From Swiss-Prot:
PROSITE patterns: RIBOSOMAL_L17 (PS01167). GO terms for molecular function: structural constituent of ribosome. One of its GO terms (biological process) is translation. Residues 126-162 are annotated as: Disordered. Part of the 50S ribosomal subunit. Contacts protein L32. It comes from the Bacteria. Keywords: Ribonucleoprotein, Ribosomal protein. GO terms for cellular component: cytosolic large ribosomal subunit. The gene is rplQ. Residues 146-155 have a biased composition (Low complexity). Coiled coil: none annotated. Pfam families: Ribosomal_L17 (PF01196). This is Large ribosomal subunit protein bL17. The keyword Ribonucleoprotein applies.
């Protein structure tokens, strides 16, 4: 029966699964992108997204909670300093899973899981919006007319043939 099976056990005992997810989460936070199987990527997504949400509020309590899951002070520091600064305005969905095909050795479905805001290819098209200020009742200042420099004229000296 399938009662009470809320998440994928990944064919591992609880301690092994928790250690594996903690190591994968530390690698994801450090490298911003890792390759793994689809099942592990989905389990990692459920594991790491609440931690990223907690990192948006930098308190000692949240740091201790994240450290209890990650078990690496370097990953916690990186999470609260770099990752939280980038995802501060995003309401959720901090990771993206991209399927890569099958592994040659055992034909396992492979995927790449990455932090969304750290991919320059997908986010490269976004530009800062330039706000124009509108004034009520008055005209905007006109730009001063620019005077163009006179064109460089070269004097040609012609020596007549004698």
């Amino acid at each position: 029966m399938r009662h009470g099976k809320k998440f994928n056990h990944l064919s591992r005992q609880k301690g092994h699964r928790a250690a594996m997810l903690a190591n994968m989460a530390c690698s994801l936070i450090e490298h911003k992108r890792i390759n793994t199987t689809v099942a592990k990527a989905k389990a990692l997504k459920q594991f790491v997204e609440p931690l990223i949400t907690k990192s948006k509020d930098d308190t000692t309590h949240n740091r201790r909670i994240c450290f209890a899951y990650l078990r690496s002070k370097y990953a916690v520091t990186d999470l609260f300093r770099d990752v939280a600064a980038k995802v501060g305005d995003r309401p959720g969905g901090y990771t993206r899973i991209i399927k890569l095909g099958n592994r040659l050795g055992d034909n396992a479905d492979m995927a790449m899981i990455e932090l969304v805001d750290f991919n320059e290819l997908y986010n490269g098209g976004k530009k800062e919006e330039v706000k124009t200020k509108s004034r009520r009742g008055g005209k905007a200042k006109k730009a001063e007319p620019t005077t163009e420099a006179p064109a460089n004229t070269t004097e040609e000296t012609t020596d007549s043939a004698e």
